[in-house]
Amino acid sequence: MTDYKATLNLPDTAFPMKAGLPQREPQTLQRWDSIGLYQKLREIGKDRPKFVLHDGPPYANGTIHIGHAVNKILKDMILRSKTLAGFDAPYVPGWDCHGLPIEHKVEVTHGKNLSADRTRELCRAYAAEQIEGQKSEFIRLGVLGDWSNPYLTMNFANEAGEIRALAEMVKGGFVFKGLKPVNWCFDCGSALAEAEVEYQDKKSSTIDVAFPIADEAKLAAAFGLPSLGKPASIVIWTTTPWTIPANQALNVHPEFEYSLVDVGDKLLVLASELVESCLARYKLEGTVVATTTGQALELINFRHPFYDRLSPIYLAEYVELSAGTGIVHCSPAYGVDDFTICKQYGLSNDDIISPVQSNGVYVESLEFFGGQFIFKANQNIIDKLVEVGSLMDTETISHSYMHCWRHKSPLIYRATAQWFVGMDKQPESGETLRKRAVKAIEDTEFVPAWGQARLHSMIANRPDWCISRQRNWGVPIPFFLHKESGDLHPRTVELMEEVALRVEKEGIEAWFKLDASELLGDEAAKYDKISDTLDVWFDSGTTHWHVLRGSHPMGHETGPRADLYLEGSDQHRGWFHSSLLTGCMLDDHAPYRELLTHGFVVDENGRKMSKSLNNVVAPQKVNDSLGADIMRLWVSATDYSGEMAVSDQILQRSADAYRRIRNTARFLLSNLSGFNPATDILPAEEMLALDRWAVDRTLLLQRELQEHYGEYRFWNVYSKIHNFCVQELGGFYLDIIKDRQYTTAADSTARRSCQTALFHISEALVRWIAPILAFTADELWQFLPGERNESVMLNTWYEGLTELPADFEMDRAYWERIMAVKTSVNKEMENLRAAKAIGGNLQAEVTLYAEDSLVADLSKLSNELRFVLITSTASVAPFVSAPADAVVTEVAGLKLKVVKSGHAKCARCWHHREDVGVNPEHPEICGRCIDNISGAGEVRHYA
């Protein structure tokens, strides 16, 4: 038998079938670095419109986890797609460097007896070390960025910029000193931001406490009685027994009805709706003597259960009837509502009783409980209430309670002297911060859209922002306070600039080593230099002001503005939140035009990642086992608007999808062997109809993908690219062209037409996948024929695709109908192969029985219909002539019949043809193959 292999155009490419991503990706990173890819992108983007994504800085502590990887990959996909869309899309990565976690790490390693200066020195060194580790892990994900020049909140320039931002806020009238209850962690020894609070279940003792009446006549009058006749008490219910020593008032709702209840030996005041449940709890029987409104009880004095002081009734609308007694005990030092109500009733800061120290221990001078830790004192307080006869009931409940996100320990509200940004404080000019922020939210685009309502609710209801902390490792609040009046120095803003200039040169250490006389001269003796530092959310929240300024051509009249902030959904209460507030104070608008949030990563069962559950997916391990491109593909395929499920099995499915895309790319490359686009490319009008359709279909898909990329809908991008590779290419077009590619003359119009289409498709596809499969796209780029620059990223979306003319006979709808017919034929072929009636499609001869309109469509392909159906013979007949055993298809007006060919198989093209062996010189091949080998070659028009 003659070997005709040498006469075929067999596919050939050096592009490897096996990706070997864990080994090849680090080499690609080295190549990007050696060619200066990021710098080249900035050079070619100089005259392009800018797109600025401002990086929310991760905390410089520990190795990266899967959530970090998701965040950085999403950012990279957006910026790569924007680059391909013709924007200059720089990426300046950042790190959040100050704050308690780093200080805590240093204390654990070096002990707690370090000097403040030494602590700062070690914290700075630790943060720098952590940044280097995280940086290499982010780079390994394929994230393009200015990694040599990241912004760090501990860079001297940024520390100085933060001080200048604070000075602007002071100048604008937003900052004030106040005594207010703030979230307080005993382990941190500091106030916490709202974003640093998490809620966990906690067991607490509830107590019902009777406060005896101090003014019997007023209470009797309030209930319309001439006298009480018995001892009377009002009963409160609380879950925090430790706050009873700090009680200073009692709250009732002005509109609720309250009852005076006779329980035998005494009278109790309770909310009318709760009398029955309270008496049941106290195991008492009673009769309602009289009722009144909360309003009538205002300012009536009761006595503290065990201290010699009064507790007046204050009206408060926050009182509820969902639990307890309808009366709330009020400790202004340990509750936000308590504090607010007491201030409304004229209680001064000096009047507020605050016996709990920063470590959670009562001051020694507190009678009965001095020196005790508050949570351990709960039982002693209960015992004291029993002793004085004021305890009505105690129970243990489990309820959601605020905890420190770092130490997981319970928090309290604690009134301390702190620096605040006022949400409703009238600034020097313009609207209040709350009004500005609400308006800014309305002017911002949100992805997903529900983020807008979430952030709006948080801003509408949040308290003033406590910006001060009592720690060493943080940007200082460089204030001088008058020793007698407590007022800020009149030249505070000017002095802050002098401090900023020093910090710019020496870092925050410049403030801490500064002697007040260096700035204040003889005035220094009259002022205290404070040691408070700024909340770390102020650090990251002001980066837009000093990092972004000057980076964007739009919005500079009123300050910088990023096109996009992108972080996890927890940042509505974190970075999005603090950045919004600082932006509205400094520039009167949000520092972003659009906010994108992604969900948290969970396992395939929706559970949080946890070492105890053994379900942690570490990005480092994924890189080493599957490759970063597989992780990137998983990110793209997952709808990030909700929780993002990942597991080894899910990643394996991504790896399978990756192989299908890679195999498609390899098929394209292997069939471009010998193709030189400079000399072999055909104009659209000379291409075969099917090839023109394939290019047109690619153009339509590119438009869809550009839209999806623009809307950050990467899961749509992924699914459409995957379907295009597997179905429209792999399941239709690429199958059909194999015969033409392999069997026609190497430089025939039929083959060059197909190669032209494959070239256009490849040029488009490599760009489509570049934002997602960053490494693979760059590898593919190196194997494409023709002269090209060093990286796919140095280009924009492919512009060589052509659209079918409006009057083209074989238009898009035509090929849709042909595809439907081919699908029906394939289905019947599968049935026959399963029944072993035929071995392969080319053993088949198919007859299509069609209605007139479909006959017209099919007849347009003439004798090339068999190449589209991939059968040795294909004929068309009227629908009415279909025999009884013809198969009814899903295509309206189409039946078909497939029979096994009785003709010999061509040894070259494998078609079963009647003319195999007709030529004695080539007895094993068909006439078409003889013509392609030694004749003028077959002519194709359509497929």
Curated annotation (Swiss-Prot):
The residue numbers the entry assigns to motif 'HIGH' region are: 58-68
Binding-site positions, ATP: K611
Query: What is a biological process (GO) this protein takes part in?
Result: isoleucyl-tRNA aminoacylation
> What is the name of this protein?
Isoleucine--tRNA ligase
**Could you say which residues bind L-isoleucyl-5'-AMP here?**
E567
Q: What class of enzyme is it?
A: ligase
Q: What is known of its domains?
A: IleRS has two distinct active sites: one for aminoacylation and one for editing. The misactivated valine is translocated from the active site to the editing site, which sterically excludes the correctly activated isoleucine. The single editing site contains two valyl binding pockets, one specific for each substrate (Val-AMP or Val-tRNA(Ile)).
Residues given in the record as Zn(2+) binding sites: C906, C909, C926, C929
Q: Does the keyword Coiled coil apply?
A: no
Q: What does this protein do?
A: Catalyzes the attachment of isoleucine to tRNA(Ile). As IleRS can inadvertently accommodate and process structurally similar amino acids such as valine, to avoid such errors it has two additional distinct tRNA(Ile)-dependent editing activities. One activity is designated as 'pretransfer' editing and involves the hydrolysis of activated Val-AMP. The other activity is designated 'posttransfer' editing and involves deacylation of mischarged Val-tRNA(Ile).
Task: Give the matching CDD domains.
Answer: Anticodon_Ia_Ile_BEm
User: Which cellular compartments is it found in?
Assistant: Cytoplasm
Establish whether keyword rRNA-binding is in the entry.
no
Q: So what EC number does this one have?
A: 6.1.1.5
Q: Which UniProt keywords apply?
A: Aminoacyl-tRNA synthetase, ATP-binding, Cytoplasm, Ligase, Metal-binding, Nucleotide-binding, Protein biosynthesis, Zinc
Which Gene3D superfamilies does the record cross-reference, listed alphabetically? 1.10.730.20, HUPs
Which GO MF terms does the UniProt record name?
aminoacyl-tRNA deacylase activity; ATP binding; isoleucine-tRNA ligase activity; tRNA binding; zinc ion binding
Needed cofactors: Zn(2+)
Quaternary data: Monomer.
The annotation note on the cofactor reads: Binds 1 zinc ion per subunit.
One Pfam match, by short name? Anticodon_1
Read off the InterPro entries from this record: aa-tRNA-synth_I_CS, aa-tRNA-synth_Ia, Anticodon_Ile_BEm, Ile-tRNA-ligase, Ile-tRNA-ligase_type1, Ile-tRNA_ligase, M/V/L/I-tRNA-synth_anticd-bd, Rossmann-like_a/b/a_fold
Q: Name one GO cellular component term.
A: cytosol
Please give the catalytic activity noted in the UniProt record. tRNA(Ile) + L-isoleucine + ATP = L-isoleucyl-tRNA(Ile) + AMP + diphosphate
